[in-house]
């Protein structure tokens, strides 16, 4: 029931899982977690598995959970305990994500190529029929002369807009999540830049932590509401309203698409209704952003959260990694720590040392700020300001 169609869908990801593992273990060898003599053997076997995937012969056996487990099982059958080491410094989270990103990157490339082919065909038809006139319509009424050249060319031009979206999607996809583990980094001294380069990513995802637990942050009193019967309550109503408003805004593309649904080429009065959903959305979004900035400025964080013994098990990964760094195969270290926790014998070492890019000890905020600045610089707002000022200036 919980697996659903995962095993079937994972076949799409098989060869990308192999590529991700090849980059990951190459990096692990560089930091001493895989032996120099082990790496060539692992890489050769992964290349064999890649060939199986490429031929369409890869299968996930009965009783095997997913593609990641199948690849590791195939390695372990051939190479023994050596195959158990490939998961060191990785979580299912960043492993799944890198597979999806590699798959999406390849799929987007195919779509870009096919879009360019369609574009070329439309331009060719536009040139071929540029002198052939046709009626132009508005409201499905004959309006003005047009041409097949203009008609085909208009659809070709619309594909350039689509190409901008594809480019944005490609840039967002082409970032390396390896090293983020379950979302909080790893205590292994991972070289994330190395896996970024090996897989041809433009950059890495520096920080993929998106969620918060209850009572980890304290909201300002003026931004919460109480209860009529429960005096202890501080409800995050403002954030709940922001969530609802933003969810409503996310529906905007669907609303616009449905309003335009089934309209042929030309102008129709249906399009007037788009203004009613489009124009007010910006005011709502600006209000949400302003309120978020106001609250974030006043948020306080609790500094003593992890003193509570209930959180001791979250340090288990650090212990697994410590054992792996001392030579124990990752899967065996994982099993040992799990048994210690189950027996009540686990005493955590709460001194954690994360150093790789995007981890607790190396946030890379300077790179994130530089990325944001480069994106802001790409808007060239000053060009618009200069043009508008020139128009408004007295002559």
PLM region spans:
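A helix-coil-helix interface module used to build multimeric assemblies
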Residues: 1-185, 189-203, 226, 239-241, ...
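Glycine-rich cofactor/substrate-binding loops
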Residues: 1-20, 230-395
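A short secondary-structure junction motif
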Residues: 78, 82, 125-132, 201-202, ...
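Short conserved catalytic/interaction loops centered on acidic-Pro-aromatic/His motifs
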Residues: 168-176, 209-217, 343-348
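Catalytic cores of enzymes that engage adenine nucleotides and/or redox cofactors via long glycine-rich
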Residues: 186-189, 209-243
